[in-house]
């Protein structure tokens, strides 16, 4: 009798133990641009080697132990903000393998621009390679894929879905604001000034297009850009699109307002004469999903506030 009870107890214990083992030793594999990455548990020490990946981690509520070009992120991207105490591991084009190894990461996130170093990174920690920006890609869709995949890896699936739902809600809200105000008729040209004669104009194949389309706005610039989604043109290239509203994305070059005010060509542009020049705060055009939400809100607020005849 005792022997039988002990055997039953032992068998039950073994079954309980075995049922717990998959949770402790479960290994999942994800495919990426240079192969696959296998993880036995959600990573806790993650390093991001580009700003789109940094942004995605922060949106998921994960603070990376290290990022590339930390100070540059604070200047050009800013939001979502980097918490204090994150290590800098060098530049985005040439990160320090030594600095990365010292942080003992259990996951490194990078893109195909770092392909020559991928094998070296893999020796340090499992490495996930995904490129939001490359020839033929659709940036918002790739950024969404990265967010969802990282959410899966890090056991943050619900956070990833919440982020995407929030973005869609924001886009719908801003679209209704513009529609109710009757501000969706004229096309919009999104530009960054490089100097007083040249701009970076954002094309239909870029990240910003997702915001324009969702807001019900036409892109005034009909031409495809490079795989980053822009073209560099002279101001004269805007002239053939007289119906457009020009939205200038900060920052601008010093003294630009005064220079343009004295430029016969600039003051001749129809959008200038109609006082349909708008200027918004910086939005990082080469990020992940978050810049789409930020651009949609800033752009809507600016169009509702009204334009002027010059940049600030």
Q: Where are the regions a protein language model picked out?
A:
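His/Asp/Glu-enriched short active-site or ligand-binding loop at hydrolase and phosphoryl-transfer sites
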Residues: 69, 205-229
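Extracytoplasmic substrate-binding proteins
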Residues: 120-194, 221-222, 285, 289-312
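Short helix-initiation/N-cap motifs at beta->coil->alpha
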Residues: 32-34, 89-97, 225-235
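Structured C-terminal subdomain patch of bacterial secreted/periplasmic proteins
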Residues: 145, 241-312
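A short, structured surface patch at a secondary-structure boundary
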Residues: 45, 51-99
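Proline-aspartate-enriched helix->loop->beta-strand connector
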Residues: 97, 101-110, 126, 235-238, ...
């Amino acid at each position: 009798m005792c022997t039988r009870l002990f055997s039953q107890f032992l068998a039950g214990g073994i079954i309980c133990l075995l049922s717990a083992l998959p949770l402790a030793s479960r290994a999942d594999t994800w495919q990426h641009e240079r192969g696959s990455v296998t993880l036995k548990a959600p990573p806790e020490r993650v390093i991001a080697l580009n700003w789109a990946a940094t942004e995605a981690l922060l949106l998921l509520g994960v603070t990376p132990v290290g990022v590339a070009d930390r100070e540059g992120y604070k200047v050009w991207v800013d939001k979502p903000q980097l918490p204090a105490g994150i290590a800098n591991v060098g530049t985005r084009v040439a990160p320090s393998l030594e600095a990365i190894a010292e942080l003992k990461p259990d996951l490194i996130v990078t893109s195909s621009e770092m392909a020559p170093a991928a094998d070296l990174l893999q020796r340090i920690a499992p490495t996930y390679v995904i490129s939001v920006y490359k020839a033929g890609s659709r940036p918002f869709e790739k950024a969404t894929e990265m967010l969802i995949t990282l959410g899966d890896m890090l056991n943050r699936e619900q956070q990833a879905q919440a982020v995407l739902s929030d973005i869609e809600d924001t886009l719908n809200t801003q679209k209704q604001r513009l529609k109710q105000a009757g501000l969706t008729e004229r096309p919009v040209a999104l530009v960054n000034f490089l100097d007083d004669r040249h701009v970076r104009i954002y094309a239909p194949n870029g990240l910003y297009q997702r915001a324009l389309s969702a807001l019900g706005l036409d892109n005034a610039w009909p031409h495809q850009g490079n795989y980053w989604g822009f073209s560099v043109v002279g101001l004269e290239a805007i002239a053939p699109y007289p119906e457009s509203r020009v939205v200038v994305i900060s920052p601008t070059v010093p003294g630009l307002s005064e220079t343009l005010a004295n430029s016969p060509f600039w003051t001749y542009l129809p959008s200038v004469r109609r006082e349909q020049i708008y200027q918004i705060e910086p939005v990082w055009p080469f990020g992940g999903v978050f810049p789409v939400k930020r651009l949609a809100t800033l752009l809507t607020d600016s169009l509702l506030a009204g334009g002027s005849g010059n940049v600030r």
